[in-house]
Regions:
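C-terminal engagement/docking regions of AAA+ P-loop ATPases
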Residues: 3-11, 52-55, 69-78, 267-335
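Conserved C-terminal "switch" segment of AAA+ ATPases
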Residues: 10-17, 31-32, 83-93, 121, ...
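Pre-Walker A (pre-P-loop) alpha-helix and adjacent loop at the N terminus of AAA/AAA+ ATPase modules
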Residues: 18-61, 277-286
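A short helix-loop-helix "switch/interaction" segment in the helical subdomain of ASCE P-loop NTPases
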Residues: 29-33, 66-71, 134, 215, ...
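Walker A/P-loop
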Residues: 54-95
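AAA+/SF3 P-loop NTPase mechanochemical coupling elements
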Residues: 59-61, 155-192
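Conserved AAA+/SF3 P-loop NTPase catalytic/coupling segment centered on the Walker-B
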Residues: 76-77, 109, 120-164, 197-209, ...
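Short glycine-rich substrate-engagement loop in P-loop NTPases that contacts/grips substrate
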Residues: 92-124
């Protein structure tokens, strides 16, 4: 029997339209700190099909998100999807993620196609492809076809079975699937590599076919300070609720947190800093029957201190020895 594209329609749209994007960049800026220019470009990429028009099962838009590590690429996409779902533009805040490094050789072809179909068939509006640099080149051709042609023919004979794409082999079938389509989803390539690397892997016509290129910037000291304060506020709220005492942080503690990113200038070091701090505060609570009234965080000799009422002391010394070893290893990397 003649093969046909996937027997489905484009993913349903939310009821809201272009007006649902009003003030979106500013709203995202409350979650993704220090990236105002990037957020403007991201909003434009998401808004583009609502201005330019889009119909059918081709990609609603295809774009690249790139930039240094730990600068908000994943966070911004998640925050945008959730906010657009809340506003009624998207039907779901979910995102489908595909790690292309899981398919390094031709032997993973069936797995790749099955996973790709599941990602395209999921209820979210966005499909993100990561680590294209480590993917089998033949599979990148499939993605290139989805972006440039709106569909990608399947070389083998496949059928849908219980919602999954299955190789039909030599079996006699009447409903073979002949091609994959983007189903009206946003297709996003996410990478730390520059645009030139994308052209090397996919070719210049593919890059030209992308609707937008959104690039994050390395976080400035001011941005890292803002991240440090925002993450501390989360820690303080969590400690008040779970540990039963108030936590404050002086300027020295906040500066130490902001500088914990090291040379990478990403937010991950700051997040890890406050994660260790919370673990140490929790350890103090575990070791004492009565909760202190408050804990005041400070810094001395490059170490985070806490004053529970008897004077400042090294907070991270409360961590179990194995965990302290991990802390020292992280510090050595940052130095």
């Amino acid at each position: 029997a003649a093969a046909a594209p996937l027997p489905n329609h484009a993913a349903p749209r939310g009821k809201a339209g272009l007006e649902g994007f009003d003030g979106l960049a500013e709203a995202l800026g409350g979650t993704v700190l220090g990236q105002p220019d990037y957020l403007q470009k991201l909003v434009i990429a998401l808004k583009r099909p609502y201005v330019m028009g889009h119909e059918g099962e081709s990609a609603r838009n295809a774009f690249l998100v790139t930039g240094p590590a730990d600068t908000g690429k994943h966070l911004s996409l998640c925050a945008a999807a959730e906010e657009l779902a809340r506003r009624g533009v998207f039907v779901s805040g979910d995102i489908s993620w595909m790690d292309l490094s899981l398919y390094p050789t031709a032997a993973e072809e069936k797995l790749f196609l099955q996973d790709l179909y599941m990602a395209l068939a999921a209820k979210g509006d966005i499909v993100v492809f990561e680590h294209y640099e480590r993917c089998q080149p033949a599979f990148l051709t499939v993605l290139s076809n989805l972006v440039q042609r709106g569909k990608s023919p399947l070389a083998g004979r496949y059928v849908l079975q219980n919602g999954r794409l299955v190789d039909a082999g030599n079996a006699l079938v009447t409903d073979a699937v002949g091609a994959l389509t983007p189903r009206g989803k946003y297709l996003v390539l996410l990478s730390e590599a520059p645009v030139a690397k994308l052209a090397d892997s996919f070719g210049a016509p593919f890059v030209s076919a992308l609707g937008d290129i959104c690039e994050t910037a390395a976080l400035t000291p001011e941005s890292l300070s803002a991240v440090a304060k925002a993450e501390f506020d989360k820690l303080a709220a969590r400690a008040q609720k779970a540990l039963g005492f108030t936590v404050t942080a002086g300027d020295a503690a906040l500066l130490l947190a902001a500088e914990s990113s090291g040379r990478a200038k990403g937010a991950q070091g700051v997040l890890a800093f406050w994660d260790r701090a919370y673990r140490a505060l929790a350890q103090y609570r575990l070791e004492h029957d009565d909760a202190p009234k408050a804990a005041a965080l400070g810094a001395a000799d490059g170490r985070l201190t806490a004053d529970f009422g008897a004077g400042p002391a090294d907070l991270l010394s409360l961590l179990p020895e194995a965990y302290q070893g991990e802390v020292e290893a992280v510090k050595a990397e940052l130095d």
